[in-house]
Swiss-Prot record:
Protein name per Swiss-Prot or TrEMBL: Protein king tubby
Subcellular location: Cytoplasm; Nucleus; Cell projection, Cilium membrane; Cell projection, Rhabdomere
Record GO biological process: protein localization to cilium
Domain of life: Eukaryota
Biased composition (Polar residues): 67-80
UniProt key word Transcription regulation: no
Phosphoserine: residues carrying this PTM: S136
Spans traversing the lipid bilayer: none
Keyword Membrane: yes
Gene this protein is translated from: king-tubby
Matching Pfam families: Tub (PF01167)
Start-end of Low complexity biased regions: 113-128
């Protein structure tokens, strides 16, 4: 009996397909016409060859293999679908978070020198292709173009009759003493007094300020409108917050608000220091302080103008930029220039009129073409480590060895910014912000 029961349980026909009643309780008549197929759910497939819940016996190994193959195939398809979805999600995230470089520009890359000099670091930056200068439309870039430029109208940092410019006997990397750490005859700067006053004060001569800019792109709107934070680097990895900047959302042109209060980046904030405004094409930027253009007591002053050369022919190569600053007085203070004052001209108007008496003209340092690497090379002495078209060094034509400011990438959202006399933190930070902004018809 036990053997019979085990055999009965092992048979596949134990589960019936319907409520079939062979004999009616009240009648001895057989009536197969009273079969009730009342299942309209999954059980309707029990009698079907395509039954997904079919119980297979050990006597049909072919069926087991078929089911196993189908299960494996479905699992493989599901895994491929999940892999495709994950790849698409990663691609979308990468595109949204990836920095949009200027399409017309070649990125600046870092090379390793084969033979390192004891007085220089091995970190240099390079851009990939030579290109013609747009203003000359020549076939080959003249490396001495900036050096041989007519600079008769370019004013020195100090007015005429003063001592020679502080550009002599100093380089931004401190290579004069072979250390490359910025201690070549000058000291690293520190915050003196209140932050809001310090960021507007020109750097003293012989003092180098090493800073770091961090870009915050987290959040709903910060992918398109990131927030930038400027910190002064100190020893042992310490840093001091100086400025924060963000791009205004509702503005016809690019307009950045700069504040020394990281919690309130608005024009009405107590820490509002100034703003950066561009033209429609993004080729010209003007830096203003926190003054009121309608006020006569404290009018809004022009702090700087940044001009990027237009790329008419579409040649690729390093960016070309011109920075115009107010001149310096005998006591190392900026000349007050206000484009809001109808009685005087602004910095941009003075530069267009070639009136260089009270303004200073700077240019990005021309990279040197390297035949071995087939690229332009600039030496940042370890302060810049990654490729970007935003990497640059600002110099004066009268002394190309004195680097007024340098800026470059060290990681995806971290950049170094070093500046010295005659710039202040507000001017240098605004110049760096202009490099982040997208540009139409610019190289």
């Amino acid at each position: 009996m036990e053997a019979y029961i085990r055999q009965k349980r092992a048979s596949p026909g134990m589960v019936q397909a319907s409520d079939l009643q062979i004999n009616r309780p009240m009648s001895g008549m057989r009536s197969n016409s009273r079969e009730l197929h009342a299942y309209d759910g999954p059980m309707q497939f029990i009698s079907s060859p395509q039954n997904p819940d079919q119980i297979l016996t050990n006597g049909s190994p072919g069926g087991i293999n078929s089911v196993a193959m189908n299960t494996s195939r479905n699992h493989s398809n599901n895994m491929r679908s999940l892999s495709t979805i994950n790849q698409e999600a990663d691609l979308i995230e990468e595109i949204s978070s990836h920095e949009l470089e200027d399409e017309e520009s070649s990125p600046v890359t870092v090379i390793e020198q084969q033979q390192q000099s004891a007085s220089h670091s091995a970190n240099s930056t390079q851009s990939q292709k030579p290109r013609a200068r747009q203003h000359s439309f020549s076939d080959n870039l003249d490396e001495d173009d900036y050096t041989n430029r007519n600079v008769a109208g370019a004013a020195p940092v100090r007015p005429a009759g003063m001592a020679s410019s502080p550009y002599k006997d100093a380089t931004l990397d401190g290579s004069s003493n072979g250390t490359g750490n910025g201690t070549g005859g000058e000291s690293e700067g520190d915050v003196i007094g209140n932050i809001d006053q310090f960021v507007m004060q020109p750097a003293p001569q012989g003092v180098l300020y090493k800073c770091r800019i961090t870009r915050d792109r987290k959040g709903m709107d910060r992918g398109l409108f990131p927030i930038y934070y400027l910190h002064l680097e100190r020893d042992y990895g310490k840093k001091i917050f100086l400025l924060g900047g963000r791009k205004r959302k509702k503005s016809k042109t690019s307009n950045y608000i700069v504040s020394c209060d990281p919690t309130d980046l608005s024009r009405n904030a107590d820490g509002f220091c100034g703003k950066l405004r561009s033209n429609v094409f993004g080729t010209s930027f003007t830096v203003f302080d926190n003054g009121n253009k309608e006020s006569t007591e404290s009018p809004r002053l022009d702090l700087a103008v940044i001009i990027y050369d237009t790329n008419i022919l579409g040649f690729k190569g390093p960016r070309n930029m011109t920075v115009i600053l107010p001149g310096m007085t005998e006591d190392d203070q900026r000349v007050k220039i206000s484009s809001a004052d109808p009685k005087q001209q602004g910095i941009l108007d003075l530069w267009k009129m070639k009136n260089m008496d009270n303004i200073v003209e700077l240019h990005n340092k021309t990279p040197v073409w390297n035949d071995e690497t087939q690229s332009y090379v600039l030496n940042f002495h370890g302060r810049v480590t990654q490729a970007s078209v935003k990497n640059f060094q600002l110099v004066h034509d009268s002394d190309p060895e004195y680097i007024v400011m340098q800026f470059g990438r060290t990681s995806e959202d971290v950049f170094t910014m070093d500046y010295r006399y005659p710039l202040c933190a507000m001017q240098a930070f605004a110049i760096a912000l202009s490099s982040f902004d997208g540009k139409i018809a610019c190289e």
